[in-house]
Amino acid sequence: DHRDLHSFPTRRSSDLVRYSYEFDERIQFGLVAEKDVGEPFWNEYHKGYDYYSVHLFLKEMNKWLKSLAIGDYKISFGQGLVISNDFSPGRNALVSQTERRTNGFRRHFSTNENDFFRGAAATVNWKNLDINLFYSYRKLDGGVDSTIVTSFKTDGLHRLVRDREKMHKVSMQTYGGNVRYATPGLCIGLTALSYSFGNYSIQPDPKPYNLFYFRGNRNLNISVDYLLKNKLIKFYGETALSRNGAVASLNALQLTP
């Protein structure tokens, strides 16, 4: 591999192209093209950059359309138990953090090749009600044995033969929605998320750390998130259920004397 790297001088450096256009804070367009160190730019396996990302994001276009995302985007609802592309703090920070305030869709404008959705999403607003719908279809890197996916590859590197053998092997289709009612003192949301992996079944090799990981071809998650507050008390959280039997709940109570 070391000799192979020196036989392609263009592999010794990473390349990044990023273009962004914004108008009146309501229209955002972006393009990202990236090649990691060690990845060829042009050969029989690679044609140009290794990673491309494009998005068009519209905000507050009229009184009903709150947001529209086409291309690559991120999602966050509730406390993130069912779905969130937000940064996740450590355990200690989680205890003292306030409730999440980024509910809805945002553009994906980074070189992270995994933590995003690709498709379309929209938020429609009516009075105190937000209705969010989204659809995504992506090809993921993974270790495949026949129709079994034993692992996912998430580093985004495609330099070696073993990397190329795992590149874009597994299709993932995701769709769902969120309905949110919000007033100054009360907020409640309902989220549903369905995802499937084409003809593949996710079956990671059993290890102590992955005993409770999802296994199978498709899954469904639903959750309810809530926030109740006044001058003295703030209670918020999210409780989620999964079709494979998993249950999760994250709640916090803050008192202000």
Regions found by a protein language model. Give the residues of each.
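Short, small-residue-biased leader/transition segments that mark boundaries at the very start
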Residues: 1-13
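Residues that define the transmembrane beta-barrel architecture of outer-membrane proteins
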Residues: 12-15, 48-52, 114-118, 171-175, ...
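Surface-exposed extracellular loop regions of Gram-negative outer-membrane beta-barrel proteins
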Residues: 15-55, 89-96, 192-243
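Residues on the lipid-exposed face of transmembrane beta-strands in outer-membrane beta-barrel proteins
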Residues: 17-21, 54-58, 70, 115, ...
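Repeated loop/turn-to-beta-strand initiation elements of outer-membrane beta-barrel proteins
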Residues: 25-31, 62-68, 128-132, 185-190, ...
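Outer membrane beta-barrel
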Residues: 38, 45-141
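Outer-membrane beta-barrel translocator domains and adjoining extracellular loop/strand segments
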Residues: 40-47, 81-86, 143-151, 200-208, ...
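Extracytoplasmic loops and strand-loop junctions of Gram-negative outer membrane beta-barrel proteins
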Residues: 101-106, 157-165, 206-210, 234-235
